A protein has these predicted regions:
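Non-heme di-metal
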Residues: 1-64
């Protein structure tokens, strides 16, 4: 389980980094692209919630 937990923790960190990347892209994007980036970013935040839920279930602790 330690390897599984480590993989989930890395996946969570990567998803958070991806959200930050999309936010930075939105700051520079032409106005017409922002809606698309918002949609993609919403998917990423859903992924964060799902992975955090898996980690919480695995450890019995809330994920901050």
């Amino acid at each position: 389980m330690d390897e599984y937990q480590a993989l989930l923790e890395k996946a969570l960190a990567d998803e958070i980094s991806t959200v930050r990347l999309y936010l930075a892209a939105m700051a520079k994007a032409p106005p017409g692209d922002v809606a698309i980036l918002l949609e993609v970013n919403a998917d990423e935040t859903d992924h964060i919630a799902l992975i955090a839920g898996l980690l919480s279930r695995l450890t019995g602790e809330p994920v901050d």
